[in-house]
Design a protein with these regions (language model features):
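Conserved donor-binding/catalytic core segment of Leloir-type glycosyltransferases
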Residues: 193-217, 222-227, 240-241
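Active-site proximal beta-strand in glycosyltransferases
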Residues: 91, 107-127, 149-151
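Nucleotide-activated donor-binding/catalytic signature segment of Leloir-type glycosyltransferases, i.e.
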Residues: 253-273
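A short, active-site helix/loop in glycosyltransferases that binds the activated sugar's phosphate group
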Residues: 141-184, 378
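Short His-centered aromatic/hydrophobic patch
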Residues: 94-100
């Protein structure tokens, strides 16, 4: 079987996906990546990869023109790649939807027997085409109709209300986590990991978000915590951690640090690259994690937090988190940021109760979210689509 994956070839999740796929089945993997080669790896688990690092440089200073035309330029370049490549694939699999991929969808059939798309959740929330979200959703619907399989965690009523024709071709698929595999084998205690990070073992570690993106609302959560009437009684017990390794703004981080210092908070601001071992140590060192992002497609960071038996305080507005509930994971769901902060103070007052509540999460995560386990659903879909390949 020959598969063309379309997505970010630099992504650690993408790399692990391809590696797990090749271990699980006989497949030739080609990758089209609409991003430059960051050279993060000495070698990739792909049989062929093409990095298309074109940017709309000519019009980059004219914001309207760039936003307006760039998806069409990106789609044209992808079309040129397919034509020049001249390969008829068994499957073209769009692992991450960009507005460009919903343009001129019918042409894909010329280069593949089957079309797959993966939806993680964010594609339905914020993307636009010609500066219109509704127009983008209309075009996305046409791409779904063209596709032979829609893979992901979007099997909820809201998604099917909007795209009822997707129901017969929807398949469950989720990325595994190499961090979860490491966590399952770690002998270090939570206190050991705190000390490895330079944090006092008796501190209650509080993680806000899982990247530097402002959509995690680090600033709003922090301000709500320090303004709470109970803050002065617990500030000496807390150590805040901000994992800002990806997509952080310098001024945004500076403002966070100013609030932390003004209120006498102990904290760590992680801005550099983190190895898998370092990420596993961070997860194990986490007592409480806030997940109050504007949107999320069930990030591996959340699954890793659960595997570490951290107490997760999460918003109830994420359409894919039903997967966690269905699997039996225990976490604290809230309707608003204000409620989340109130719940946080209850956790601080009754730590052992909440630690006991989430104690089975590690076993559940280890059983369900290793790459060896998760890749099975993806392999099943591929083999259903191309049984003779």
């Amino acid at each position: 079987m020959r598969v063309l994956l379309v997505g970010d070839a630099n992504s650690i999740f993408f790399v692990h996906y391809a590696d797990a796929l090749k271990k699980a089945m006989d497949v030739e993997i080609h990758v089209y990546s609409p991003f430059p080669n960051k050279q993060d790896y000495q070698s990739y688990p792909y049989d062929y990869v093409y990095f298309d690092d074109y940017l709309l440089k000519k019009y980059s200073d004219i914001r309207f023109v760039s936003w307006f035309y760039e998806p069409y330029v990106e789609r044209a370049r992808f079309g040129r790649f397919l034509k020049k490549n001249g390969i008829k694939y068994d499957i073209i699999h769009f692992q991450w939807i960009m507005p460009a991929w919903v343009v001129c969808q019918k042409a894909y059939r010329k280069y593949a027997d089957k079309i797959c798309i993966t939806l993680w959740g964010g594609e339905l929330e914020h993307l636009q085409l010609l500066r219109s979200h509704n127009y983008y959703l209309t075009k996305l619907g046409k791409l779904i109709k063209l596709s032979d399989a829609v893979i992901g965690t979007m099997a909820n009523q809201g998604f099917f209300d909007r795209f009822p024709f997707a129901k017969p071709i929807s398949r469950y698929g989720i990325y595994g986590s190499s961090i979860i595999e490491k966590l399952s084998q770690m002998s270090e205690t939570r206190e050991d990991c705190k000390q490895q990070m330079g944090i006092s073992a008796d501190k209650i570690t509080v993680v806000l978000g899982y990247s530097g993106k402002m959509l995690h609302n680090h600033d709003k959560i922090l301000n709500d915590i320090v303004k709470h009437e109970g803050f002065k009684d617990v500030v000496d017990k807390l150590h805040f951690i901000f994992p800002m390794s990806r997509n952080f703004g310098a001024s945004y981080c500076d403002n966070l640090e100013a609030v932390l210092k003004q209120n006498g908070c102990s904290y760590s601001m992680i801005k550099g690259y983190m190895s898998d071992d370092a990420v596993a140590c961070l997860r194990k060192a986490t007592d409480v994690m806030f997940q109050l992002s504007d949107f999320d497609g069930l990030s591996n960071s959340i699954k890793e937090c659960l595997c570490a038996n951290s107490v997760l305080i999460s918003g109830d507005w994420f359409p894919t988190y039903h997967v966690l509930k269905d699997a039996g994971f225990k976490y604290l769901e809230v309707h608003s940021r204000e409620e989340a902060v109130d719940v946080f103070y209850k956790v601080i007052e009754n730590q052992q109760y909440y630690y006991d509540l989430v104690n089975d999460n590690k076993n559940l995560a280890t059983q369900q979210y290793s790459w060896t386990e998760c890749i099975k659903n993806w392999v099943k879909v591929y083999k259903e689509l191309c049984p003779e390949s």
